[in-house]
Swiss-Prot record:
A Pfam family: 2OG-FeII_Oxy
Encoding gene (name): GSL-OH
Record keywords, A-Z: Dioxygenase, Iron, Metal-binding, Oxidoreductase
Composition skew (Polar residues), residue ranges: 349-359
Protein's name in the database: Probable 2-oxoacid dependent dioxygenase
Amino acid sequence: MAENYDRASELKAFDEMKIGVKGLVDAGVTKVPRIFHNPHVNVANPKPTSTVVMIPTIDLGGVFESTVVRESVVAKVKDAMEKFGFFQAINHGVPLDVMEKMINGIRRFHDQDPEVRKMFYTRDKTKKLKYHSNADLYESPAASWRDTLSCVMAPDVPKAQDLPEVCGEIMLEYSKEVMKLAELMFEILSEALGLSPNHLKEMDCAKGLWMLCHCFPPCPEPNRTFGGAQHTDRSFLTILLNDNNGGLQVLYDGYWIDVPPNPEALIFNVGDFLQLISNDKFVSMEHRILANGGEEPRISVACFFVHTFTSPSSRVYGPIKELLSELNPPKYRDTTSESSNHYVARKPNGNSSLDHLRI
């Protein structure tokens, strides 16, 4: 049968339907189409672990009121970002009702009639608002079982009338809240690096916000595909909002760690650009999203904090000079920050997306 498989034609046919994976599921598909088959799907861990390893949960409450509390939080964030590149945060300042409304708003968008969703379907990279299935559909070796509504929310804030009616208002409200939280976290990360609180903000690390609103429909064969294949994020920092269905795993010491859902938490992770400018002090860890084996669509919202989406950008990034010494020389060459670099960076064959910049 392999000789009769025309992958390019099947990708094109799927894309031109403009209904996404959700459209396939709603139509009653009972088998995962071959374009989604991923030979690397292996939910089992490659080796046993003798200890239970968990991504830490950090309470951010009180960081503005108490120097002692702030110093404690900085120390915990430093440890988490050096060891795991991930942590969950509670008491982060984003109202829980705003988080819930955001999840519900994105669920409403993906639950709309396919003919309504089609109006937003595009692969035009010049558009700030896009809906499609798999940004890298034609480039990746296997498509993932998900659909995405994405929008550039900063530095140029979109107008409400340019966003989908069913979720535009909450997208704007949530982005305001998460931008405030990111400013706080970049202060904490700066202090964790031994720098002044405003250092990373003054490098424009919190300037750009790219919001990816994912829907992971139920998968009839979750052992054949991923919701998101193994990758790192080409951001400075990513803040992730999940519903209660889980699915996120982080690779630590060769072992896949589940990140259990917590309705009150937001997940923070280091992106490749933060690893670069911190000169490997903070680590951008590989992670993946398992296909949804449940009965209801899984929803998540990933906020990527990047420099800018104006292309090309002349801003140059390299290891922060204040972190360097004779004993800690730069590990990366300087690079310009281009909008295309902020797309998800895959690591085929275990090669880091930063390898081409490593000295």
